[in-house]
Amino acid sequence: MEQAMEIAEIVDYAKPCMDAERALKDAHNAVLEGKMELAMTKAMDALVSVRLMQGALRHMKEQNG
């Protein structure tokens, strides 16, 4: 008799973390170049990525106790 294969859900927190780091770096560089609209957009991108990371970490915590 075949056994059902258990499928593990992988939650990636590292990608949003790296995306946030990149967005913050881009925001900083935009400020240095005087591109304030771009800086504000990149800052918002960083916030979105941090929120995704927070959700992934919360999910991991719930799964691991």
Regions found by a protein language model. Give the residues of each.
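Short, charge/polar-rich alpha-helical segments
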Residues: 2-14
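Short amphipathic alpha-helical heptad-repeat segments
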Residues: 12-23
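Short, charge-rich amphipathic interface segments used for partner binding and complex assembly
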Residues: 22-64
